[in-house]
From Swiss-Prot:
Higher taxonomy: Bacteria, Pseudomonadati, Pseudomonadota, Gammaproteobacteria, Pasteurellales
PANTHER family attached to this UniProt entry: GLUCOSE INHIBITED DIVISION PROTEIN A, PROTEIN MTO1 HOMOLOG, MITOCHONDRIAL
GO cellular component: cytosol
Gene: mnmG
InterPro entries linked to this entry: FAD/NAD-bd_sf (IPR036188), GIDA_C_N (IPR049312), MnmG (IPR004416), MnmG-rel (IPR002218), MnmG-rel_CS (IPR020595), MnmG_C (IPR026904), MnmG_C_subdom (IPR047001), MnmG_C_subdom_sf (IPR044920)
Protein name: tRNA uridine 5-carboxymethylaminomethyl modification enzyme MnmG
Main location group: cytoplasm
Organism: Haemophilus influenzae (strain ATCC 51907 / DSM 11121 / KW20 / Rd)
Entry's localization field: Cytoplasm
Binding site for FAD: G13, G14, G15, H16, A17, G18
Family: Belongs to the MnmG family.
One of the GO BP terms on file: tRNA methylation
Length: 629
């Protein structure tokens, strides 16, 4: 039967990609439906109970800057906050929050249920309806049909998911949840390129059976960071420590003696796992020279006895998992509450997607999250937001929007996926970004909030707060530029006490702040430069902009050079077979990838600068040479 209402956007899946994908078009004013197999697991943290980290924290800030939910939920649920790389430069500093699973899920569900234009319905989707290569709706397990102008698929690990514990395996989307088998079969019929990936999770341990007294304690930061630009430290719940233990030679011996029972080492698992989050059996075999690996014991919540042992993800049999756990210091008498497991699942080649995350072959069908070959809550959330935005724009028949590589880590992520594809679970790192000095956590709002306002993603309160911050930054920079200190000043002696070398020529406040020994706090403690500004976010921007001005200007010059042809559009109907001078190999790769811009084409492996020049000449000849935004 047909459901009576027609939607603008339907989102399948209520994980980290799905929740952002549903909220974005709803905030833009589009009637949106979120289909989930279980409303009680919306925003579920299926693996590590943490948000953020190197590169990942940048994505969280970007999602927040565009009105997304993840940062707000992390602030509400974070039970230990840390700033990683705090002693390094601002480009690589990253926020991480250990999270209470229950509080996080509650924050997500509350936001979804209170969002206008958004309906939530509990049903497993089994079919995507398509007419003349255009999506028209979704069918569910109980025979309901929902009509929609666009559909976003965010199925995570559920598509033909198979769970492995030892040599035993069974269908499942994650522990306790069934797999989406029918939907997987339907998607395979669409002709999209599909393959298998694998991820895993460690056993959960009963905290009451751990001897914490003999373990090293890890506290969070004393000055607590905040994820959301609209957040406050007052949003954070009680803060608690994590603990550290280590594997040892006994642990490694248990693992080596049981590799014949490992689904990874006996060929049962065919999917490729995440390079940067390997299983403990992988670590022991790949790093055979190491006799110890550090394991973080992370609490799963303020009211839970479960502990997440970060670093021993495994698919070995349960008795072997017990041997691994009990071999470590402090865990000699520990009990496992939930066994660890590996899961294989379908993912689709992201090279079959436009940078908007719409499929190239089916209009109005978008993919986001792990089904695009990524790993991590943060990568999923960023994709969900982008897909949600473009699903809304598609409904309005407006121009699509997606960020450039020099604009955000989301832009880096999507460009890497859609241009290069991936054969293993992809995660974001700061090292993947060419212009990371410009793509910092602290300036995500400056980069993206004006765009979010233009797209209708943020409310007036956020916009007003952002504009006030920008005004504070400009006023303070003007103030520091206008106050000069000269060698005959009555304040010279006071200044020389904090300067590394005495002042010998006239200098403005900006000039003094550029000195390596000077900070904003020290500068504004000097009489001429009092008082300090109260807006700490604005202070941070002022200090970074002044101290790193030369480096920032250099990167901006590099970007302008790159932009010259980066955004030159290649029409979807461009016929490479009629371009003389291209080798058969280059022509085949271009036909396969169908890049949407010269910049994207240039990053395809094997596409030479000479080939790019030939394409540009032909675009010009055919009157197709149009610059993108």
């Amino acid at each position: 039967m047909f459901y009576t209402e027609t939607y603008d956007v339907i989102v399948i899946g209520g994980g980290h990609a799905g929740t952002e994908a549903a909220l974005a078009p709803a905030r833009m004013g589009f009637k949106t439906l979120l289909l989930t197999h279980n409303v009680d697991t919306l925003g579920q943290m299926s693996c590590n109970p943490a948000i953020g980290g190197i590169g990942k924290g940048h994505l969280v800030k970007e999602v927040d800057a565009m009105g997304g939910l993840m940062a707000h939920a992390a602030d509400k649920a974070g039970i230990q906050f840390r700033t990683l790389n705090s002693s390094k430069g601002p480009a690589v500093r990253a926020t991480r929050a250990q999270s209470d699973r229950v509080l996080y899920r509650q924050a997500v569900r509350t936001a979804l249920e209170n969002q206008p234009n958004l309906d939530i319905f509990q049903q497993e989707a089994t079919d995507i309806l398509i007419e003349q290569d255009r999506v028209t709706g979704v069918s569910t397990k109980m025979g309901l049909t929902f009509r929609a102008k666009s559909v976003i698929l965010t199925a995570g690990t559920f598509l033909a998911g198979k769970i492995h514990i030892g040599l035993e395996n069974y269908e499942g989307g994650r522990a306790g949840d069934s797999a989406s088998v029918n939907l997987s079969h339907r998607l395979r019929d669409l002709g999209l390129r599909v393959d298998r990936l694998k991820t895993g999770t460690p056993p959960r341990i009963d905290a009451r059976t751990i001897n914490f007294d003999i373990l090293a304690k890890q506290h969070g930061d004393e000055v607590l960071p905040v994820f959301s630009f609209m957040g406050s430290v007052d949003d954070h719940p009680q803060q608690i420590p994590c603990y550290i233990t280590h594997t040892n030679e006994q642990t490694h011996e248990v693992i080596r003696n049981n590799l014949d029972r490992s689904p990874m080492y006996t060929g049962v698992i065919e999917g490729i796992g995440p390079r940067y989050c390997p299983s403990i059996e992988d670590k022991v075999m790949r790093f055979a020279d190491r006799n110890s690996h550090q394991i973080y014991l992370e609490p799963e919540g303020l009211t839970s006895n479960e502990v997440y042992p970060n670093g021993i993800s495994t698919s070995l049999p349960f008795d072997v998992q017990m041997g691994i756990v009990n071999s470590m210091k402090g865990l000699e008498n520990a009990r496992i509450v939930k066994p660890g497991y590996a899961i294989e699942y379908d993912y689709f080649d992201p090279r079959d997607l436009k940078p908007t995350l719409e499929t190239k072959s089916i209009s109005g069908l978008f993919f986001a999250g792990q089904i695009n070959g990524t790993t991590g809550y943060e990568e999923a959330a960023a994709q969900g937001l982008l897909a949600g935005i473009n699903a809304g724009l598609y409904v309005q028949e407006k121009d699509a929007w997606y960020p450039r590589r020099d604009q955000s880590y989301t832009g880096v992520l999507v460009d890497d996926l859609c241009t290069l594809g991936t054969k293993e679970p992809y995660r974001v790192f700061t090292s993947r970004a060419e212009y990371r000095l410009l793509l910092r956590e602290d300036n995500a709002d400056i980069r993206l909030t004006p765009i979010a306002h233009e797209l209708g993603l943020i409310d007036e309160a956020r916009w007003a707060r952002f504009n006030q911050k920008m005004e504070n930054i400009e006023q303070e920079r003007q103030r520091l530029r206008s106050i000069w200190l000269h060698p005959r000043s009555e304040y010279l002696e006071e200044a020389n006490k904090v300067l590394g070398s005495p002042l010998v020529r006239e200098a403005s406040g900006e000039d003094l702040l550029r000195r390596p020994e000077m900070t904003y706090d020290i500068l504004t403690s000097l009489t001429p430069y009092k008082p300090a500004m109260e807006d700490k976010e604005a202070v941070e921007q002022v200090e970074i902009a002044i101290k790193y001005q030369g480096y920032i200007e250099h990167q901006q010059e590099e970007i302008e050079k790159q932009k010259r042809h980066e955004n030159t559009a290649i029409p979807a109907n461009f016929d490479y077979s009629k371009v003389s001078g291209l080798s058969n190999e280059v022509r085949a790769k271009l036909e396969q990838h169908r890049p949407v811009s010269i910049g994207q084409a240039s990053r395809i492996s094997g596409i030479t600068p000479a080939a790019i020049s030939i394409i540009l000449v032909n675009l010009k000849k055919q009157g197709m040479l149009k610059r993108g935004e």
